[in-house]
């Protein structure tokens, strides 16, 4: 991997922190290509997806192993168009597998950060849920999301600017009920995601264009992190309470809870909060600096969360710890 002159070399990548992203940055082609070229990752993907496939069989979904790792893997569009929950199980399995491969190469992480859907993979990686139960919860969430109409739009601006855009677009609600559009996720000082009805998001995107602020509708057919989704959140929490939990092998910090999870947390309720409460990434990134990490790794297929981590940490530390998105870096030293 090409290192900046100020960056520590891989042999100093101690006490790593693993970052588990949400659903907005999943690339099945990157997963497939990396699994074919990286033996350690390929082994981890086989092992994890084999366990996930006990759940696909149980719940009537297509088996992921032969599909993802076979001679004709699906496109992202084909995966998204498959039975409800298929893409979420693929993302969940990919994140847990990347975590395992990274742990084999660089040691068990000192901590993990879970962002939205990524909390399920983070808790599973820490041993709180088994892979099978984590996959069941991922499918439960996918089913809950079918009752979450609307969409999500990424804005290239600060949280303050995003809130100003919502006011300009006239989509902040009247105070008589849930607001139309809300700030759903704060990734860093220059990246925010808003959630709400599709028509209202179009107004926000128009206001953003008028201000020359980048706006991109995420390719996700649902809303999330919105206070109007309470019913879906309660249904999801009920489903998750059926799964046993164990003590975490390492600390897991939640971008929605804004803190480290503890042994007395009602995890079903906290995971359901991901449907109705906003996520803020910068505070939990700053929290995990307490573990003195030499490196932060994105445990997913993309690089958006790693990019946000670089932005946040560079503003706070000089030098900041290294941050890498292994599957997005062809020369990453596995």
Regions found by a protein language model. Give the residues of each.
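FabD-like malonyl-/acyl-CoA
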Residues: 2-168, 172-176, 214, 218-220, ...
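Short Gly/Ser/Thr- and Asp/Glu-enriched loop/turn motifs at secondary-structure junctions
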Residues: 149, 185-193, 219-222, 247-248
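Helix N-cap motif at beta-to-alpha junctions
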Residues: 159, 196-201
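Short amphipathic alpha-helices in soluble, non-transmembrane regions
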Residues: 166-170, 201-211
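Short helix-capping segments at alpha-helix termini
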Residues: 173-176, 210-211, 243-245, 313-319
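A short linear hydrophobic-aromatic micro-motif
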Residues: 179-184
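Acyltransferase
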Residues: 213-299, 303, 307
